[in-house]
Amino acid sequence: MYVVRTVKNKEKTLNNMTEDKTVAVVMCTYNGEKFLREQLDSILRQTYPISEIIVQDDCSTDSTVAILRSYAARDGRVRVIVNEHNLGFNRNFRSAVMKATTDFVAISDQDDVWMPDKIERQVEAIGQYNICYSDHLRGTTLEGAHTVSPRCSLEALMFGGFAGHTMLLRRDFVQRDDVWMDGIYYDWSLGLNAYFHGDKAITHIGKPLNWHRSHPQEAALLQSLSVNPAPKSRPTWQPYVLGYAHFRRLQRKPAWQRLYSHILENTRDPRFHLHHTMARLMLSHNPLTMLRLCTICMKHRRDIYPNAAKTNGIMGMVRGFCWPMIFAYRCSQFDL
């Protein structure tokens, strides 16, 4: 049986850790000069020893590479690779991760800030799980940031992943070619495939261990805006009314077909009966199957809907039922 675990907050000491487990940090950069030093400094201040810091730059045109080389000159753990041509953040992360030689791999963005005990807590928690991830803070400033606590059930991962910058992964898992799928965000692919390799998939630390800085130049935001320009106002009724058409449009995309066919193929075991059914419904163009998918999402809304506080009462049932349309509205995750 696959396992998902949530680790409760509790005090840890370095003496309790398995200190012989080695950790590599993998960071991908592109024109990140503004916030790069702050992130590198937070990695170097970790309470758990970092064995190597692999930074792969994707043809930056600012001073990013010069900053990286200055850190490498001062600290032998920092290894800088500069791509000959631009790969894009998905392929860049895949390429960089394959260069790690440690027991565990931690993924890092170029503009975040890590809490000093991030890696310490994750090494303690991961055990035999493929992935350990944590809550994170998100906002333009640390003081004004809010906590993000993504879902990691396989039902939730049918509709999107949790952030790569919160992940610590077993190297023997993350370096498998078959856990990296083309056409969707790499962290969504890793989260999904954690369920299809071994009995222990994902463990979750319910405490923010990094600050994900929101700013206009962050890579995921730019990717999303390249597909869907920012709306003039926050959507209210639009996902409920227009989401069905968006869902049908997404179904025609090759990346959609590959993803849900992959899930369908890997959920034939009876323990994945619910997810096998959901994948089949995601691929179907029959309007009646859409009703069944919506009903399943309503029934399992507390495991699927991103905000647990909004799953109660009549409106919670409506949100759960309409989740496939809400998910599809302005979705850019199949346009990589």
Which residues does each predicted region cover?
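Cell-envelope/extracellular polymer assembly enzymes that use nucleotide-activated donors
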Residues: K21-A24, E52, S189, N193
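Conserved nucleotide-sugar donor-binding catalytic segment
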Residues: M98, S153-P229
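Short, well-formed alpha-helical segments that are part of the catalytic scaffolds
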Residues: G32-R45
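Conserved donor NDP-sugar-binding/catalytic core segment of glycosyltransferases
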Residues: D117-A145
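A conserved acidic beta->alpha catalytic loop
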Residues: D57-A66, H85
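C-terminal subregions of glycosyltransferases and related glycan-biosynthesis enzymes
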Residues: K8, I184, F196, K200-I202, ...
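Short aromatic/hydrophobic "clamp" motif used to bind/position activated sugar donors
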Residues: V105
